[in-house]
Design a protein with these regions (language model features):
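Short glycine/threonine-rich beta-strand-turn micro-motifs
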Residues: 157, 343-357
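Interdomain boundary/hinge elements
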Residues: 28-31, 142-154, 188-199, 236-250, ...
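Conserved Switch II/interswitch segment of TRAFAC-class P-loop GTPases
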Residues: 61, 66-72, 80-104, 108-130
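P-loop NTPase switch module centered on the Walker A-proximal segment
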Residues: 1-90, 134, 203-206
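Canonical P-loop GTPase G-domain recognition
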Residues: 113, 123-186
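A short, contiguous, amphipathic alpha-helix enriched in charged residues
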Residues: 309-332
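Conserved nucleotide-binding/hydrolysis modules and their immediate coupling elements
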Residues: 197-302, 312-314
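Charge-rich, low-aromatic oligomerization/scaffolding segments with amphipathic character
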Residues: 127, 279-282, 355-371, 407-408
Protein backbone atom coordinates (compact mmCIF):
# COMPACT_ATOMS: atom_id res chain seq x y z
CA UNK A 1 0.00 0.00 0.00
CA UNK A 2 1.63 3.24 -1.18
CA UNK A 3 0.66 6.44 0.60
CA UNK A 4 2.05 9.68 1.96
CA UNK A 5 2.37 10.08 5.75
CA UNK A 6 -1.07 10.39 7.37
CA UNK A 7 -3.13 9.58 4.30
CA UNK A 8 -4.68 6.67 6.17
CA UNK A 9 -2.66 3.68 5.03
CA UNK A 10 -2.44 1.89 8.36
CA UNK A 11 -6.08 2.72 9.16
CA UNK A 12 -7.15 1.09 5.89
CA UNK A 13 -5.22 -2.07 6.78
CA UNK A 14 -6.99 -2.05 10.17
CA UNK A 15 -10.39 -2.10 8.49
CA UNK A 16 -9.34 -4.81 6.03
CA UNK A 17 -8.28 -6.95 8.98
CA UNK A 18 -11.53 -6.28 10.87
CA UNK A 19 -13.75 -7.03 7.90
CA UNK A 20 -11.98 -10.25 7.01
CA UNK A 21 -12.96 -11.54 10.48
CA UNK A 22 -9.53 -12.18 11.95
CA UNK A 23 -10.58 -10.94 15.38
CA UNK A 24 -12.58 -12.98 17.89
CA UNK A 25 -15.94 -11.45 18.79
CA UNK A 26 -14.76 -10.46 22.28
CA UNK A 27 -11.27 -9.29 21.30
CA UNK A 28 -10.27 -5.71 22.11
CA UNK A 29 -9.23 -3.95 18.93
CA UNK A 30 -6.74 -1.07 18.99
CA UNK A 31 -6.62 1.55 16.25
CA UNK A 32 -3.73 1.44 13.75
CA UNK A 33 -2.94 -2.08 14.82
CA UNK A 34 -0.11 -2.47 12.25
CA UNK A 35 1.88 0.30 13.98
CA UNK A 36 2.73 -2.03 16.82
CA UNK A 37 5.68 -0.10 18.31
CA UNK A 38 4.98 2.53 21.01
CA UNK A 39 6.89 5.16 19.05
CA UNK A 40 5.01 4.33 15.87
CA UNK A 41 1.72 4.81 17.69
CA UNK A 42 2.76 8.11 19.30
CA UNK A 43 4.24 9.68 16.19
CA UNK A 44 1.59 8.22 13.89
CA UNK A 45 4.20 6.87 11.48
CA UNK A 46 5.20 3.42 10.29
CA UNK A 47 8.89 2.66 10.82
CA UNK A 48 9.28 -0.99 9.88
CA UNK A 49 7.59 -2.73 7.00
CA UNK A 50 5.13 -5.30 8.30
CA UNK A 51 3.32 -8.20 6.70
CA UNK A 52 -0.10 -9.62 7.28
CA UNK A 53 -2.54 -11.79 5.38
CA UNK A 54 -6.31 -11.78 5.10
CA UNK A 55 -8.67 -14.25 3.47
CA UNK A 56 -11.49 -13.13 1.18
CA UNK A 57 -13.86 -15.76 -0.20
CA UNK A 58 -11.19 -18.42 -0.38
CA UNK A 59 -8.38 -16.21 -1.72
CA UNK A 60 -5.42 -15.36 0.49
CA UNK A 61 -4.30 -11.74 0.16
CA UNK A 62 -0.85 -10.86 1.50
CA UNK A 63 -0.70 -7.23 2.60
CA UNK A 64 2.55 -5.39 3.23
CA UNK A 65 2.47 -2.06 5.06
CA UNK A 66 5.55 0.03 4.30
CA UNK A 67 7.00 3.22 5.81
CA UNK A 68 6.42 6.44 3.87
CA UNK A 69 9.36 8.35 5.37
CA UNK A 70 12.58 8.73 3.36
CA UNK A 71 14.80 7.78 6.34
CA UNK A 72 13.30 4.33 6.12
CA UNK A 73 13.42 4.26 2.30
CA UNK A 74 15.60 1.15 2.33
CA UNK A 75 12.53 -0.71 3.54
CA UNK A 76 10.32 0.38 0.64
CA UNK A 77 12.42 -0.74 -2.31
CA UNK A 78 12.99 -4.20 -0.88
CA UNK A 79 9.33 -4.70 -0.07
CA UNK A 80 8.19 -3.86 -3.61
CA UNK A 81 10.04 -6.97 -4.75
CA UNK A 82 7.66 -9.09 -2.64
CA UNK A 83 4.37 -7.97 -4.19
CA UNK A 84 2.46 -8.35 -7.49
CA UNK A 85 0.52 -5.11 -7.33
CA UNK A 86 0.09 -1.95 -5.29
CA UNK A 87 -2.74 0.13 -3.87
CA UNK A 88 -2.08 3.84 -4.39
CA UNK A 89 -3.84 5.53 -1.49
CA UNK A 90 -4.41 9.27 -1.84
CA UNK A 91 -6.08 11.77 0.49
CA UNK A 92 -9.18 13.30 -1.17
CA UNK A 93 -8.22 16.79 0.04
CA UNK A 94 -4.41 16.83 -0.19
CA UNK A 95 -3.97 14.88 -3.42
CA UNK A 96 -0.78 13.03 -4.38
CA UNK A 97 2.24 14.17 -2.35
CA UNK A 98 6.03 13.91 -2.90
CA UNK A 99 6.53 10.68 -0.93
CA UNK A 100 3.76 9.01 -2.90
CA UNK A 101 5.69 9.92 -6.03
CA UNK A 102 8.97 8.33 -4.91
CA UNK A 103 7.44 4.94 -4.05
CA UNK A 104 5.00 4.93 -6.98
CA UNK A 105 7.86 5.52 -9.42
CA UNK A 106 9.68 2.46 -8.04
CA UNK A 107 6.49 0.37 -8.33
CA UNK A 108 5.80 1.44 -11.92
CA UNK A 109 9.40 0.66 -12.92
CA UNK A 110 8.87 -2.88 -11.64
CA UNK A 111 5.75 -3.14 -13.82
CA UNK A 112 3.32 -3.57 -10.92
CA UNK A 113 -0.42 -3.18 -11.47
CA UNK A 114 -1.96 -0.26 -9.58
CA UNK A 115 -5.34 0.15 -7.87
CA UNK A 116 -6.08 3.81 -7.08
CA UNK A 117 -7.94 4.38 -3.81
CA UNK A 118 -9.07 7.90 -2.94
CA UNK A 119 -9.41 8.00 0.83
CA UNK A 120 -11.13 10.39 3.28
CA UNK A 121 -13.93 11.23 0.81
CA UNK A 122 -16.02 12.25 3.84
CA UNK A 123 -13.75 15.24 4.53
CA UNK A 124 -15.49 18.59 4.22
CA UNK A 125 -12.65 19.97 2.10
CA UNK A 126 -12.49 16.92 -0.22
CA UNK A 127 -11.92 17.82 -3.90
CA UNK A 128 -12.39 14.44 -5.50
CA UNK A 129 -12.54 15.46 -9.20
CA UNK A 130 -9.37 17.57 -9.00
CA UNK A 131 -7.49 14.87 -7.10
CA UNK A 132 -8.43 12.31 -9.76
CA UNK A 133 -6.94 14.61 -12.42
CA UNK A 134 -3.79 15.09 -10.32
CA UNK A 135 -3.35 11.32 -10.04
CA UNK A 136 -3.67 10.91 -13.82
CA UNK A 137 -1.10 13.69 -14.34
CA UNK A 138 1.24 11.97 -11.89
CA UNK A 139 0.91 8.64 -13.75
CA UNK A 140 1.61 10.47 -17.03
CA UNK A 141 4.67 12.17 -15.54
CA UNK A 142 6.06 8.86 -14.32
CA UNK A 143 5.71 7.21 -17.75
CA UNK A 144 3.08 4.69 -16.70
CA UNK A 145 2.14 2.09 -19.31
CA UNK A 146 -1.30 2.20 -20.91
CA UNK A 147 -2.53 -0.54 -18.59
CA UNK A 148 -1.19 1.22 -15.49
CA UNK A 149 -2.82 4.42 -16.74
CA UNK A 150 -6.24 2.73 -16.94
CA UNK A 151 -6.07 1.58 -13.33
CA UNK A 152 -9.37 0.97 -11.50
CA UNK A 153 -10.29 3.77 -9.06
CA UNK A 154 -12.19 3.27 -5.80
CA UNK A 155 -13.48 5.82 -3.30
CA UNK A 156 -13.33 5.08 0.38
CA UNK A 157 -13.36 6.29 3.93
CA UNK A 158 -10.92 4.05 5.79
CA UNK A 159 -12.07 5.31 9.17
CA UNK A 160 -15.68 4.31 8.47
CA UNK A 161 -14.55 1.14 6.73
CA UNK A 162 -16.49 1.70 3.49
CA UNK A 163 -15.51 1.69 -0.21
CA UNK A 164 -17.48 2.26 -3.41
CA UNK A 165 -16.96 2.35 -7.19
CA UNK A 166 -18.21 5.94 -7.57
CA UNK A 167 -17.65 9.14 -5.55
CA UNK A 168 -21.38 9.60 -4.91
CA UNK A 169 -22.30 5.95 -4.32
CA UNK A 170 -22.88 5.16 -0.65
CA UNK A 171 -20.42 2.51 0.57
CA UNK A 172 -21.43 -0.34 2.87
CA UNK A 173 -18.13 -2.12 3.55
CA UNK A 174 -14.77 -2.80 1.92
CA UNK A 175 -16.08 -5.55 -0.38
CA UNK A 176 -15.52 -3.46 -3.56
CA UNK A 177 -11.83 -3.14 -2.59
CA UNK A 178 -11.38 -6.85 -1.82
CA UNK A 179 -13.17 -7.76 -5.06
CA UNK A 180 -10.98 -5.42 -7.14
CA UNK A 181 -7.80 -6.81 -5.57
CA UNK A 182 -8.82 -10.40 -6.32
CA UNK A 183 -9.97 -9.63 -9.89
CA UNK A 184 -7.30 -7.14 -11.00
CA UNK A 185 -4.01 -8.02 -9.30
CA UNK A 186 -2.39 -11.14 -10.80
CA UNK A 187 -1.65 -14.20 -8.70
CA UNK A 188 2.05 -14.97 -8.23
CA UNK A 189 3.61 -16.97 -11.03
CA UNK A 190 6.08 -19.52 -9.82
CA UNK A 191 6.49 -23.23 -10.37
CA UNK A 192 6.02 -25.06 -7.04
CA UNK A 193 7.77 -28.12 -8.54
CA UNK A 194 10.98 -26.25 -9.51
CA UNK A 195 14.06 -26.06 -7.22
CA UNK A 196 13.57 -23.64 -4.31
CA UNK A 197 14.48 -19.95 -4.72
CA UNK A 198 13.53 -17.24 -2.23
CA UNK A 199 14.89 -13.73 -1.60
CA UNK A 200 15.08 -12.58 2.03
CA UNK A 201 13.47 -9.12 2.05
CA UNK A 202 13.27 -8.44 5.74
CA UNK A 203 14.50 -9.84 9.02
CA UNK A 204 13.15 -10.09 12.51
CA UNK A 205 14.81 -11.15 15.74
CA UNK A 206 13.50 -13.21 18.59
CA UNK A 207 15.39 -14.04 21.81
CA UNK A 208 14.30 -17.68 21.65
CA UNK A 209 14.93 -18.63 18.02
CA UNK A 210 17.45 -15.94 16.99
CA UNK A 211 17.27 -14.40 13.54
CA UNK A 212 14.13 -14.85 11.49
CA UNK A 213 14.28 -14.35 7.72
CA UNK A 214 11.16 -13.16 5.86
CA UNK A 215 10.66 -13.35 2.12
CA UNK A 216 8.52 -14.45 -0.78
CA UNK A 217 9.10 -17.81 -2.42
CA UNK A 218 9.84 -17.12 -6.10
CA UNK A 219 9.69 -20.75 -7.12
CA UNK A 220 9.72 -24.20 -5.58
CA UNK A 221 8.55 -25.35 -2.17
CA UNK A 222 10.17 -24.80 1.24
CA UNK A 223 9.75 -27.43 3.96
CA UNK A 224 10.57 -27.60 7.64
CA UNK A 225 13.95 -29.28 8.36
CA UNK A 226 14.98 -28.85 4.70
CA UNK A 227 18.69 -28.40 3.91
CA UNK A 228 19.27 -25.22 1.85
CA UNK A 229 22.05 -23.10 0.32
CA UNK A 230 22.36 -19.38 1.08
CA UNK A 231 23.93 -17.20 -1.63
CA UNK A 232 24.39 -13.49 -2.30
CA UNK A 233 23.99 -11.70 -5.66
CA UNK A 234 26.53 -8.94 -4.85
CA UNK A 235 29.05 -11.37 -3.34
CA UNK A 236 29.12 -14.46 -5.60
CA UNK A 237 31.87 -16.06 -3.49
CA UNK A 238 29.60 -16.19 -0.45
CA UNK A 239 27.83 -19.50 -0.12
CA UNK A 240 26.70 -21.21 3.06
CA UNK A 241 24.62 -24.20 3.98
CA UNK A 242 21.72 -24.01 6.39
CA UNK A 243 18.66 -25.79 7.69
CA UNK A 244 15.10 -24.50 8.00
CA UNK A 245 14.40 -25.27 11.67
CA UNK A 246 10.99 -23.59 11.91
CA UNK A 247 8.64 -22.22 9.25
CA UNK A 248 5.77 -19.75 9.74
CA UNK A 249 3.13 -18.11 7.57
CA UNK A 250 1.51 -14.74 8.26
CA UNK A 251 -2.08 -15.01 9.33
CA UNK A 252 -3.94 -11.94 10.50
CA UNK A 253 -1.71 -10.23 13.04
CA UNK A 254 0.45 -13.16 13.99
CA UNK A 255 2.57 -15.91 12.55
CA UNK A 256 1.45 -19.50 12.65
CA UNK A 257 3.75 -22.51 12.30
CA UNK A 258 3.44 -24.55 9.08
CA UNK A 259 5.38 -27.51 7.69
CA UNK A 260 5.66 -26.40 4.04
CA UNK A 261 4.84 -23.51 1.69
CA UNK A 262 5.12 -23.15 -2.08
CA UNK A 263 5.76 -20.44 -4.71
CA UNK A 264 4.03 -17.10 -4.11
CA UNK A 265 3.70 -17.44 -0.33
CA UNK A 266 5.34 -14.92 2.01
CA UNK A 267 6.90 -16.90 4.86
CA UNK A 268 9.18 -16.47 7.87
CA UNK A 269 11.78 -19.06 8.84
CA UNK A 270 14.40 -19.50 11.55
CA UNK A 271 17.47 -21.64 12.06
CA UNK A 272 20.19 -19.75 10.17
CA UNK A 273 22.32 -17.42 12.27
CA UNK A 274 23.94 -15.47 9.40
CA UNK A 275 20.83 -14.90 7.30
CA UNK A 276 20.47 -11.26 6.28
CA UNK A 277 18.50 -9.08 3.89
CA UNK A 278 19.37 -9.61 0.24
CA UNK A 279 20.56 -13.20 0.59
CA UNK A 280 18.81 -15.86 -1.50
CA UNK A 281 17.75 -19.17 0.00
CA UNK A 282 18.05 -21.87 -2.70
CA UNK A 283 17.90 -25.59 -3.22
CA UNK A 284 21.48 -26.93 -2.74
CA UNK A 285 21.48 -28.47 -6.25
CA UNK A 286 20.73 -25.13 -7.97
CA UNK A 287 22.14 -22.11 -6.09
CA UNK A 288 20.94 -19.10 -8.12
CA UNK A 289 21.02 -15.76 -6.25
CA UNK A 290 18.31 -13.20 -7.07
CA UNK A 291 19.30 -9.56 -7.70
CA UNK A 292 18.21 -7.07 -5.05
CA UNK A 293 18.43 -3.36 -4.31
CA UNK A 294 21.57 -2.55 -2.33
CA UNK A 295 20.77 -0.90 0.97
CA UNK A 296 21.78 2.77 0.94
CA UNK A 297 24.84 3.79 2.93
CA UNK A 298 24.41 5.76 6.17
CA UNK A 299 24.51 9.56 5.88
CA UNK A 300 25.00 10.80 9.45
CA UNK A 301 26.84 9.60 12.53
CA UNK A 302 26.60 10.17 16.27
CA UNK A 303 28.74 8.96 19.16
CA UNK A 304 26.94 7.01 21.89
CA UNK A 305 28.92 6.76 25.11
CA UNK A 306 28.60 5.92 28.80
CA UNK A 307 27.12 8.75 30.83
CA UNK A 308 30.03 10.29 32.78
CA UNK A 309 28.27 13.49 33.86
CA UNK A 310 27.72 14.38 37.57
CA UNK A 311 24.16 13.03 37.22
CA UNK A 312 25.24 9.58 36.03
CA UNK A 313 23.26 6.59 37.22
CA UNK A 314 20.16 8.48 38.33
CA UNK A 315 17.77 7.54 35.54
CA UNK A 316 18.65 4.29 33.83
CA UNK A 317 19.09 0.66 34.84
CA UNK A 318 21.71 -0.15 32.19
CA UNK A 319 24.64 2.22 32.49
CA UNK A 320 27.84 0.34 31.58
CA UNK A 321 29.60 0.13 28.23
CA UNK A 322 28.93 -3.61 28.15
CA UNK A 323 25.18 -2.94 28.35
CA UNK A 324 25.47 -0.42 25.52
CA UNK A 325 27.53 -2.75 23.35
CA UNK A 326 25.09 -5.64 23.80
CA UNK A 327 22.09 -3.45 23.02
CA UNK A 328 23.64 -1.95 19.87
CA UNK A 329 24.72 -5.38 18.64
CA UNK A 330 21.16 -6.60 19.16
CA UNK A 331 19.85 -3.67 17.12
CA UNK A 332 22.25 -4.54 14.28
CA UNK A 333 20.62 -7.96 14.03
CA UNK A 334 17.35 -6.44 12.83
CA UNK A 335 18.28 -3.04 11.37
CA UNK A 336 20.43 -3.42 8.27
CA UNK A 337 20.91 0.28 7.51
CA UNK A 338 22.61 0.92 10.87
CA UNK A 339 26.42 0.77 11.24
CA UNK A 340 28.22 0.62 14.61
CA UNK A 341 31.97 0.95 15.22
CA UNK A 342 33.70 0.96 18.61
CA UNK A 343 35.69 4.02 19.58
CA UNK A 344 37.83 3.30 22.63
CA UNK A 345 36.40 1.29 25.51
CA UNK A 346 33.16 3.06 26.30
CA UNK A 347 32.11 4.95 23.16
CA UNK A 348 30.50 3.79 19.92
CA UNK A 349 30.09 5.55 16.59
CA UNK A 350 26.56 4.87 15.36
CA UNK A 351 25.74 5.76 11.75
CA UNK A 352 22.26 5.78 10.22
CA UNK A 353 20.10 6.98 7.34
CA UNK A 354 19.07 10.28 8.92
CA UNK A 355 18.28 12.13 12.13
CA UNK A 356 14.89 10.47 12.47
CA UNK A 357 16.41 7.00 12.13
CA UNK A 358 18.87 7.65 14.99
CA UNK A 359 16.44 9.61 17.18
CA UNK A 360 14.04 6.67 17.17
CA UNK A 361 16.85 4.32 18.23
CA UNK A 362 17.89 6.67 21.08
CA UNK A 363 14.32 7.09 22.30
CA UNK A 364 13.69 3.31 22.17
CA UNK A 365 16.85 2.66 24.20
CA UNK A 366 15.95 5.35 26.73
CA UNK A 367 12.55 3.76 27.31
CA UNK A 368 14.13 0.35 27.76
CA UNK A 369 16.13 1.76 30.69
CA UNK A 370 19.47 2.50 29.02
CA UNK A 371 21.35 5.59 30.16
CA UNK A 372 23.78 7.09 27.67
CA UNK A 373 25.14 10.35 26.37
CA UNK A 374 25.16 11.23 22.68
CA UNK A 375 27.18 13.67 20.59
CA UNK A 376 25.65 16.07 18.06
CA UNK A 377 25.15 14.33 14.70
CA UNK A 378 27.70 15.00 11.97
CA UNK A 379 27.56 14.29 8.25
CA UNK A 380 29.66 11.39 6.99
CA UNK A 381 32.35 12.25 4.45
CA UNK A 382 33.76 9.93 1.83
CA UNK A 383 37.54 9.54 1.51
CA UNK A 384 39.54 8.15 -1.41
CA UNK A 385 43.36 7.83 -1.20
CA UNK A 386 43.36 9.97 1.94
CA UNK A 387 41.51 12.83 0.23
CA UNK A 388 38.05 13.92 1.30
CA UNK A 389 35.84 13.75 -1.77
CA UNK A 390 33.36 16.53 -2.29
CA UNK A 391 29.82 15.29 -2.82
CA UNK A 392 28.53 16.00 -6.32
CA UNK A 393 24.79 16.10 -6.54
CA UNK A 394 22.86 15.82 -9.76
CA UNK A 395 19.40 17.18 -9.16
CA UNK A 396 16.52 16.64 -11.54
CA UNK A 397 13.49 18.75 -10.70
CA UNK A 398 10.19 17.79 -12.29
CA UNK A 399 7.83 20.75 -12.32
CA UNK A 400 4.88 21.80 -14.44
CA UNK A 401 5.94 24.41 -17.03
CA UNK A 402 4.14 27.26 -15.27
CA UNK A 403 6.58 27.05 -12.32
CA UNK A 404 9.70 26.68 -14.44
CA UNK A 405 10.76 30.33 -14.18
CA UNK A 406 10.37 30.50 -10.39
CA UNK A 407 12.41 27.35 -9.84
CA UNK A 408 15.24 28.42 -12.14
Amino acid sequence: IIAHVDHGKTTLVDEMLKQSCIYRENQTVVDRVMDSGDLERERGITILAKNTAVHYKGTKINIVDTPGHADFGGEVERILKMVNGVILLVDAAEGPMPQTRFVLQKALELGHKVIVVINKIDRLDARIEEVMDEILELLLDLNATEEQFDSPTLFCSARQGVASYGPTEPGVNLDPLFKTIVDYIPAPTGDPEAPLQMLVSSIDYNDYVGRIGIGRIERGTIRQNQEVSICDYHDPEHSAKGKVVALYEFDGLGKKPITEASAGEIVAFSGMADITIGRTVCAPELPEPLPFVKISDPTIEMTFSVNDSPFAGREGKYVTSRNLRDRLNRELLKDVSLHVTEQGTDAFNVAGRGEMHLSILIETMRREGYELQVSPPHVLTHEENGKVMEPMERVVIDVPEIYQGNVM
